């Protein structure tokens, strides 16, 4: 996230000269066809997920399960550390990337897929949907939103990821409102977001942000504090896949491993997000 932004812990125009029925148009048709199936799968059993503004921010609170989710716009410095840590612990994570990321790091995407992780959308152009000071207004039209999402899924398709493998997405900046969630759902895509409270999403902050900066130790201790007070059942815990070079204290380098070990000792299981949400897929992922 850019420097001017404050992490939130509460709850491009696209044109083509190709023929009308291009890959994007085909994808529009495909997403529409898949929408009913995806929603049917999600509603197959009683929905115990927790929603905020139409997005899932927590899975079944009665289950001692945590889902690790990672987002990235254009940075991938955590790739080796994160992939190796998850592999060591036998955990399948969920990774949400922008279109730029898919274009910059195809080999990393391939690695993640080969390891059996879910790889999905973080939008194509990393658009800011609403002003930070007014969540109820919009900076994008529905048409702009849909074109951006279709372009995102086209980039995913080129990487070998079908819609059925990733019918969920984390919005850019982890920031959305009810209207965005409704537009996404109309396309057959469910918004998901991190569970607020632990401040794990503040792992991108840099020392020059002053009082807004959160060290890895602070974040780890905050997670443990929340666990002790109310538990982490059903939490979607977000960690950034890469952060600014000005942040040398990378959470994924040492604290991710420590966090997993500690929470496992406390009896938590790390559950793939689609399984935790209750969406079944025929994918090998």
Model-identified regions with their sequence ranges:
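Short, surface-exposed alpha-helical recognition segments that flank or form part
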Residues: 15-18, 22, 70, 140-144, ...
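Active-site beta->alpha N-cap acidic-glycine motif
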Residues: 45-137, 151-167, 259-262, 278
């Amino acid at each position: 996230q850019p420097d001017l932004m404050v992490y939130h812990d509460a709850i491009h125009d696209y044109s083509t000269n190709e023929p009308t029925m291009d890959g994007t148009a085909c994808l529009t048709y495909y997403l529409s066809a898949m929408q009913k199936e995806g929603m049917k799968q999600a509603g197959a059993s009683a929905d115990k997920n927790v929603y905020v503004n139409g997005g899932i921010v927590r899975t079944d609170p009665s289950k001692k399960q945590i889902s690790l989710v990672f987002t990235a716009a254009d940075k991938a410095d955590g790739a080796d550390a994160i992939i190796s840590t998850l592999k060591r612990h036998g955990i399948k994570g969920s990774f949400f990337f922008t279109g730029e990321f898919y274009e910059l790091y195809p080999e990393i995407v391939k690695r993640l897929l080969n390891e059996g992780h879910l790889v999905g959308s973080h939008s194509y152009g990393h658009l800011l949907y609403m002003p930070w000071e007014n969540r109820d207004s919009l900076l994008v039209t529905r048409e702009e939103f849909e074109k951006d999402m279709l372009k995102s899924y086209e980039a995913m398709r080129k990487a070998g990821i079908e819609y059925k493998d990733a019918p969920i997405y984390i919005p850019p900046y982890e920031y959305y409102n009810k209207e965005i969630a409704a537009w996404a759902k109309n396309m057959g895509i469910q918004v998901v977001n991190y569970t607020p409270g632990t401040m794990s999403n503040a792992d991108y902050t840099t020392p020059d942000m002053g009082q807004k900066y959160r060290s890895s130790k602070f974040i780890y201790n905050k997670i443990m504090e929340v666990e002790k007070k109310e538990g982490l059942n059903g939490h979607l815990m977000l960690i950034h896949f890469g952060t600014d070079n000005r942040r040398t204290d990378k959470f994924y380098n040492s604290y991710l491993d420590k966090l997993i070990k500690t929470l496992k000792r406390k009896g938590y299981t790390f559950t793939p997000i689609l399984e935790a949400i209750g969406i079944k897929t025929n994918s090998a992922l």
